[in-house]
Amino acid sequence: MSEPVLSSLRIEPLNPSHLARCRVIAESGALPRFQAVLIGDWLARFEQRFPDLLPSRSPRCLVALDEDQLLATVVARPYNRRGTCWTLQLPELSGETSRHSLRDVQHDLLLEALQLGAPQVCSWVIRCPASDADAIALMRELGFQPLRPYQSWLPPQPSASPSSLRGIDPLSWLPITRRTAQLLWPIEQVGNFSHLRQITDRHWLDLLDRNAPGCGVLVDGETVLAGCICLTESSDHGTFELLRDVAWDPRLEQALPVVLGRVLQQGALRSLITAFDDAPLSRVLEAQGWTRGGEQLLLGRSMWRRHVAHRNLQLSRSLDDVFGRLRPQGSPLPNPSLGPRCLGPR
């Protein structure tokens, strides 16, 4: 009796007919977002077909269907321009009743999403609330491992007119460009250990894709103190990440309130992500009225193959074979005698 129920669950790429039939998407106001994802899904197929010509930027979307009823959707996005690492969002449930358990729907949907772009895609990452034990257990079942915790912050009400950095010379707030992205890149990488850097396989050019209104870099000449980038892989739109150098600069206590005020004024910021154990930064945020949200956990799954060097047979020959070439091949010549020589009869 259970086989017909299980066989009725289908996983398909998002297409226009799904949007036309899904009443929940239209009523929730998410139709424009799914239309943009649908266009991105078409572009992503061309990007994955020509990876050497087109950088990977467009998302892919899969839907779970029970007959003609849409149960859930999942969006996958490139995490780098190379297309070697992608990020998943937790499946978005439509709220429709189903004969299938929600865990089965999420499991099958995510399992199918992990096949997108193979074999080019070598690793995956996903962000989960640390309090969502079910989601973390599901991702662990699919081969994901915890990589790094983050702290989420909810913003205060923005002020009418943000302050200026003129009193904190020579600091300046610059937009993210090719030059400032290269300056920010070491700070973005210093908080990630080597295994995480291997999984994400990113380059400083990938920071350009995380630029949005309100993002920028706080610099003192050629030295970067902090930066703010947009998390495009987050399911919560309007999520920004605040980065800073490992060494705490006392000027950040005055500069960060000004910077965050500009981000609130210019960008549609709904939440801010920081390092989980950054106590000095947490004190500055709390003093400015930011409230702690939930803890987030970055999980990753790597399919990189460790390259084992093959033994070079030419270098593994025995010493006898090597020195054998030095041995004489013919009869040995007599050694000269050191005694008196007889040149003839006396």
Locations of regions flagged by a protein language model:
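Active-site/acyl-donor-binding loops of N-acyltransferases
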Residues: S2, P129-S131, E141-S164, S271-R346
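Amide-forming acyltransferase catalytic core, primarily the GNAT-like/NAT-type
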Residues: E3-A76, E141-G238
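Structural motif
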Residues: L14, V74-V75, P91, R127-A130, ...
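Short, structured motif recognition centered on aromatic/hydrophobic residues
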Residues: C61-L62, C85-Q89, L110-L114, W124-V125, ...
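Conserved acetyl-CoA binding element of GNAT-fold acetyltransferases
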Residues: G83-S101, S235-P250
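Conserved GNAT acetyl-CoA-binding A-motif
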Residues: W86, G117-P129, Q265-D277
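Conserved acetyl-CoA-binding loop-helix of GNAT-fold acetyltransferases
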Residues: S98-Q115, E141, D249-L264
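Intrinsically disordered, low-complexity segments enriched in Gly and acidic/Ser/Thr residues
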Residues: G221-S271
